C-alpha cells in the first residue's frame, strides 16, 4: 500500500497511447489499478502514484499531497496532455492533481472517477481515528456479522482495537500491528485533508463511473455523482453506470470487465 521509493510504480509498459496515472484509494490501496489494468484494452502504459513511505511526514493539505505527486508524473511524462484516475475517496486526490496541473498551464485530457464521494460526503470525517477505524471494520463484514464488532471500544488504543478486530475475524491476522497503526494514522489523516478540500470547477470533462447497486442497509447511502453535481454544478460530468456496489464493482471480475470496457470507451 505504501511505497518506500520516491517514484511512480509501473503497472503496465508499452502502448501507442498516452499513459494513465492512477492514485491509491482512500485506504492507500492501489491493488485495484493492477487488477483493472489487466482488463483495459486501450494500448497505453499504466502507472500508480503511491503515497509516501510509512513514517514520512504527512502532507499539510491535499493540495500539498498533489504537488508531491506531480514530479512523479512528469518524471515519466514531462508534458501533457495527462490522464489521471482514482477510485473511492482517492479520486479527490486525482481531482486535486488535475487542478494543480491545469494551474501550471498543463493540459489534462482525461480525469476518471470510480465511485468517488464528494469531499463533503466523506464518511466519518468528523470522527476521531478510533471511531473511523471501527466503522471501516464494520463496513467490510457482512450485515449479519456486523453486530459482533459492537464490542470494539473507542476508549481502547488503536493497536488494541486492531488486535480485537483480528480476534473477531474482521482483520488480517498476518500483519505487523505497529505498522498497521502507522498506516491507519496516514489513512485517517488523508480522510481529514480530503474532506477539507474545496474543489473549484475545472475546464475539462469528468468521466464518472459509478456503482449501479445500493449499499447494504447497515451502511450509509450516498449519492456519489449527485454530490459532485451539487458541489460543482458547472462541471461537465459524463456518468456511466457499472454493475455492482462500491466494492464489488471492482472486486467482481465480471463487473470489473464492464468497468474496463467503459474506461476504454472514455479513453478513446
Task: For each feature predicted by the language model, list its residue ranges.
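A hydrolase-biased, glycine/serine/histidine/acidic-enriched motif that marks catalytic-domain neighborhoods
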Residues: 1-268
